């Protein structure tokens, strides 16, 4: 028995959970999984603390939520942990089952099936199974046969995923066999030879599987899928036949789901109900089986009746053996890490925890006949043993023993014969399976025989023939004749008028030709032939007078089927032609078969059949007699066994007497061995005493020698001590020299890296500029003219519709003009749809080109990275090589441009896929819907036309905004390039300073080294060493005092640095003032134009012209200030150098300050660039866009009133509120008292009559819309208004507008058109 193995796997956060800002609540440690309830406060003790976190222990816990984590578990690791056991169990003969359980979107299908780049458990298990089969068959250790089937359970109905479309697609029934358990009736089983066959069937099944998109998952499995592998293996194990059959169920379950979370309705809701029903039943089965297992383990507890509801769902019925039956089962519980799915995750973990307690009873599935052979062999071996024991005692010459030996020999011969038959059967099976050109598959209750080669199928007129004869026509020539021919014939036939060498079938490149030989009788489709004839699919061939065949050519038939599908060949005419040909051929052939000859052959066959029947009866009689003889022999063996038991009892008595005698002898032997051991111990003790004396003498001698050596070493060390001190100081100076050189080299590299970064920054901005230009070209490619034409057409249609509406209001309805206007609108939509379709094709073609370019850039980048890695590894091996060190940065510089190009292409592709193409598809879908709905009412048509006009206006405004943004970006790029040139001058000066310092340090170190060398030579001449050491110490002290003086200089440098930072802040403030002046110029230009269209058309040229005058002025001031600051800093640095700043510590401090200053300048410039990029000129011209697209009727009876939908857009924020006319009037009265400028605005007057007339309401809508636009235009320019552009700038937002007036604030009832605003 074995319990169900349970593994838990957590997936990463998906996009939906990230949008909801979900928290991570799953932690895993080895086999433990912990879930945290964030709704319970942290820090609780007792029950509340335990309720906050719950810990479960499983067989395996797989953490797959973060690929960067060291505990990350990939698909490959999951297979190695679980899949290898499944493959091993299959080869051992056990059934196995793997299924994934969890809520929808938790990663079940990914774990089981995977995706194209990362296969799941099911493909990996199949691949592992066949790889092991190939390893085994390579050494001819065993034979194998593998069948697969693939089904899905959709809405509690079983469907065969590998069957062709038929009427029985969802009508497969589930039955239960008394011994083999549940099975699916008429489920197709497919024989496979390798993993490629399995993969092909799996892909075909996955295409047919039912999936759909839900609110929680884009591709959600709407059915349970079971992929079953029936694996049979046969081999000889120690000369014993062995045949096992294993079934592997690989299950991909649909996920449990809640209707409110997925947003399911209609069919999706019904599917979800059936999915939840089967999963609830699965949970009930798991609970019941866990209770049964716990009752079985607790023997003292009272047994209770537990019912396992297998048949409550099709899923649990088919998995009956896998749950608590004959199978080794693995359950993978997939969970989400987000707190928004806490309830579903906890439920999954609890079910998985209960499944651990299920106890299965797996057994090896051995073939019944093989099992019988093995048991018979065991019985023969046992009888042989008994017979041998009996012969040794008293039955050596008895007739009973001789008779028993004879019967045993007969049984052995019979076992050998059965084994041989079993071996021949498997050899034939393997030969058929290895034949790649012939495939046998089951189709319903029938069997289909598929062949790849051209072949002949025999049409036998013998009524007693039961087989199907198929002859392959191999490449080359196939000879046909009788068995008495002089040469061996490939196809041997018998019959009237058949020559010994009759004809030849020649197959050259798939073209088959029939060549009759020397007067032989051959007919094709009833026509006698005497020369080579080309054969076509379906031809009927007669050889002689009695051998008829049908010729099949699979490739030619496939081509004909394709033609029939494409309409080139009518199926009706093709079938009638085939029928007529078959009828003519058969009738022509029957002319050659006389009735008498047929009756004679039939009588001969009946006589043969009668003789065979008699032979069978004789064999049955013989078998009965053999069976009776075997029973008699078994009775004799039983009596012999009883006699043998008596003899064995006598032998045991004799063995006991022998044991007593041997015990006495062993005691004597032990006494002798004890005396011998005593003697050996005395001899060893004497030897040890002699060795101890010898060892003491050796130790004393060794100590004396060691003392003498120690004295000599001390003398030698005293002589070397003074020399060692000098060398140590020399090494210390050398180290300091190397450190100084290393630091200077680092400074040089830092300056070079700064230069590269600045160049890359300029290149990046240039890339952005080019990207924006191409993006605008992409959007403007003929679209502006097209949009303007459509807008003009829509204005004409709208005028016609308004005339019809005015005529209807006056009581004079013109139906013909309404119909013409609607026809014009529909014709406009058709033209628009055609243009959209053409544009979609262009975009799709452009998308393919971009994908191809991205793939090429990725390949180039991978090649460059591989070369860079190889050179890096070579540099690690050869660090001392100076020439190799410069090659790696050069390779890195090659990689950077390729990465930028790749990022640019990917951004282009992403913009096309996420923005342009979806917008186009949405517009095309809207056009389709309008055309499908047909003619609309006047109001609906007018609403659609006005909506289209508003969209066209927004598109034109967007095009103008992109053009303005491109001009701004180009100005920013020029500004940044100018800054980069000034930075280049600063870096050159800094490099010159570093080189001069490096030269001074090198000279100082060379002088110190020369002094030490002189000291060493003086020591060699035995001069006074103490004076030299004291002199060097005094020099070092003087150096230390010099360093203290340099610290004062360092303080002054820091003060200068602070002053420099203050000047830079002043510079930034001046730049900000210049930008503010540009914004004010934009505001002045905007005041000169009345309408939105006029502003967009006429304000772009003056603003750009003014900006072009201001930008050079701003650049000139910045350049002058930077140049002045550079010169001042260089003078300060030269002054510090002249005063003696030469030590390494001070040098490093200065360089660090220089580096920090450069970084600060760079960050400051980047901030200025980012600000300039973030400011959209079009947004500053028209930051608030407001419109009233429609009005709706709310309330009933006396409370009925019209509400206007007000759509407000502030920069990139858009929202909608519904307000009635009285709210507009209240806002105007309230704000008019605060801001006098509003009194000059014209507010739509109140009317006593006609307030519910739609014509009046339509006019009021346009008046209110104009009022709101004028209202914001005044407020943005008013100095007393909180919305003034100089006060808010880019901080203008939805919050600012709502704080200005509650009229624009969205209330509780503003989320639909049924509010009371």
Curated annotation (Swiss-Prot):
Would you tell me the Gene Ontology cellular component terms?
cytoplasm; cytosol; early endosome; early endosome membrane; endosome; kinesin complex; microtubule; spindle
Q: Which residues form the Kinesin motor domain?
A: 3-358
Q: In which tissues is it expressed?
A: Primarily expressed in brain. Also present in kidney, liver, intestine, placenta, leukocytes, heart and skeletal muscle (at protein level).
Q: Which PROSITE patterns match?
A: KINESIN_MOTOR_1, KINESIN_MOTOR_2, PX
Phosphothreonine is carried by which residues? 577
Its principal location?
cytoplasm
Describe the location of the PX domain by residue ranges: 1182-1296
Q: Pfam families given for it?
A: FHA, Kinesin, PX
Q: Where in the cell is it found?
A: Cytoplasm, Cytoskeleton; Early endosome membrane; Cytoplasm; Cytoplasm, Cytoskeleton, Spindle
* GO BP: any one term: fibroblast growth factor receptor signaling pathway
UniProt feature, compositional bias: Polar residues: 1036-1048
Q: Which residue stretches belong to region Disordered? A: 1036-1057
UniProt superkingdom: Eukaryota
Question: Which residues bind ATP per the record?
Answer: 102-109
Q: Which residues form the FHA domain?
A: 478-529
Which InterPro entries does the entry mention? FHA_dom, Kinesin_motor_CS, Kinesin_motor_dom, Kinesin_motor_dom_sf, P-loop_NTPase, PX_dom, PX_dom_sf, SMAD_FHA_dom_sf
Subunit: Interacts with RAB14. Interacts with PTPN21.
Q: Domain comment, in the record's words?
A: The PX domain mediates binding to phosphatidylinositol 3-phosphate (PtdIns(3)P), phosphatidylinositol 3,4-bisphosphate (PtdIns(3,4)P2), phosphatidylinositol 3,5-bisphosphate (PtdIns(3,5)P2) and phosphatidylinositol 3,4,5-trisphosphate (PtdIns(3,4,5)P3). Does not bind phosphatidylinositol 4,5-bisphosphate (PtdIns(4,5)P2).
Similarity remark? Belongs to the TRAFAC class myosin-kinesin ATPase superfamily. Kinesin family.
Its annotated function is as follows: Plus end-directed microtubule-dependent motor protein involved in endosome transport and receptor recycling and degradation. Regulates the plus end motility of early endosomes and the balance between recycling and degradation of receptors such as EGF receptor (EGFR) and FGF receptor (FGFR). Regulates the Golgi to endosome transport of FGFR-containing vesicles during early development, a key process for developing basement membrane and epiblast and primitive endoderm lineages during early postimplantation development.
What protein does this entry describe? Kinesin-like protein KIF16B
Species of origin reads Homo sapiens (Human)
